[in-house]
Amino acid sequence: TAGYEDEPSHTVTTVIVPHNAKSGQLVNYLAYIDSNGAQCAPSYSMRQGSKFLNDDLLNYQQLLFSTFLNEGWILTIPDYQGPQRAFAAGRLEGRMSLDGIRAALNFGEIGLEKNTSVVTYGYSGGAIASGWTAALQASYAPEINAIGFAMGGTPANVTSTVQSLDKGVFSGLCVAGITGIIYAYQVVQDWFQNHLYPKGNDAIEYARSHCITDIFSRYPFSHVFSDDFFRNGSSILYDPTIQSVISDIVLGLKESETPKAPVYMFHSQHDEIVPFSDARKTSHNWAKHGADVFFQEFSDLPIGHALSEITNIPNSLFFVRDRFAGKPFPKGYTRKVTGNGLEEPNASLAGLGELVRAIQDIQGREVGPADSELKQFILDRN
C-alpha cells in the first residue's frame, strides 16, 4: 500500500470465509481500533490466545461481524492504521482499507473474482476509515466494484471531535488521536519535537503501546490541549503547520472526493463522543456534490454513541443485504429521524431477531458446521 505522501508502505488484512460463503460478495469490515498499540490491530487482537479476545470492545464488535458471517458474506478486516498505527489519519486509513480489498480480491485461494461486489462498513473510529474509503475509492481504486458504504457515529472532523472530548471522560481519545496524526505525518512529528512537555511525551509514549480501554482509564478528564502537555497547548490546533494537515482530513470538503456508490450514515443527535453536526454536514456536502446519501438520525435521549450501533444492527444488516440484492437506493439526499434504530418498521420484528442472534453469537452460540468437514476429510483420506 502507500502512505500519505505516496511512500511505499504495507499492512495486514484478516480474511474470514464463513462455511456458507457466497461467491462474489465481500464485506470490508472496518473495526474501530481507536488506539495506537501494535497489539490493538485486528490481526493481533482476534488471534486465538490473545488476551483481547476477552476485551469488551472487541466482543461488542463481534455482534455485527458475526451477523455478517451468518449471512454468508466473506469479510476482510484490515489493519487500516498501517505500520505507524496512525489512528485518525483518515486519508491514510482510506488507502489501507482499499488496498486491503485489493489484497483479498487478488488472493486466489479465497476464490473471489475481480468484479466481486464490495460493501464497506465502519462505526466510530472505523467510520473514519469507512468515510475515507468512500471518498477515495473512485480516484485511488476505481477498479473495485464498490456498491455501498455504511458508517455510523462518524468523526468527520477530527479537530472538532478532539476539542469536544478534551477535559471529558473520554479525553484519552484526544491523546490517541494526536498520537496517530503525529506518526502519520512527518511534518507534524517534526513540529511536535519542539512543543512536547514531559507529560505530553509520556502520554504519547503510553498511547503507542496501549489499547483504548487502558488509554481511557489513564487519561479521563485530562485537559490535553493545555500547557501541561504541550507548549502553547491551547492553541496547537490553530498553528499553521498543524492546520495544514488537519484541515485536509475533513470529510466531504472536496467535490473530487465524492462517493460514487450509495452511502448510509446513522448518528445519534445526542452522541456524547462524536459531534453529530459534523457528520450531518459531511452528508449534506456529499449529496450536494452528487452522492446518494441516506442519513438516519436517532432522537431518543438515552441513545448515545455506544447504543446507536447496537440498536441499529438490523438496519446496517438490511443495507448490506439490499446492496448485494441489487435493490433500489433513494437518489439524492434522504434524511430520516427515528427514536432509535429498532423503531424502523422493517427492523421491529425481523431486526430484533437478528439482534438476539447477534448477542447469542458473542455468548458462544455455535456458528457453522463444527467439525463435520474435518471428520469427512479424515474419512475420505482413510
From Swiss-Prot:
State which residues carry a glycan (glycosylated): N115, N157, N232, N346
Which coarse location class applies to the principal site listed for this UniProt protein? secreted
Look up the EC number in the record and give it.
Answer: 3.1.1.-, 3.1.1.3
Q: InterPro entries this protein is in?
A: AB_hydrolase_fold (IPR029058), Lipase_secreted (IPR005152)
Location relative to the cell: Secreted
User: What are this entry's molecular-function GO terms?
Assistant: triacylglycerol lipase activity
Q: Which reaction does it catalyse?
A: a triacylglycerol + H2O = a diacylglycerol + a fatty acid + H(+); a monoacylglycerol + H2O = glycerol + a fatty acid + H(+); a diacylglycerol + H2O = a monoacylglycerol + a fatty acid + H(+)
Disulfide connectivity for this sequence is: C40-C211
GO BP terms in the entry: lipid catabolic process
Q: Name one Pfam family in it.
A: LIP
Q: Which UniProt keywords apply?
A: Disulfide bond, Glycoprotein, Hydrolase, Lipid degradation, Lipid metabolism, Secreted, Virulence
SUPFAM superfamilies per record: alpha/beta-Hydrolases
Gene Ontology, cellular component aspect: extracellular region
- Relate the induction remark in this record: Constitutively expressed regardless of pH conditions or exposure time.
Family to which this protein belongs: Belongs to the AB hydrolase superfamily. Lipase family. Class Lip subfamily.
Relate the protein's function as given in its record.
Answer: Secreted lipase that hydrolyzes acylglycerol lipids such as triacylglycerols and consequently releases free fatty acid. Can hydrolyze 4-nitrophenyl palmitate to release 4-nitrophenol and palmitoic acid. Due to an absence of fatty acid synthase genes in Malassezia species, secretory lipases are essential for the yeast to generate free fatty acids from degradation of sebum and assimilate them as lipid sources for growth. Plays important roles not only in lipid metabolism but also in the immune response of host cells and pathogenesis.
Task: From the Swiss-Prot or TrEMBL record, give the protein name.
Answer: Secreted triacylglycerol lipase LIP5
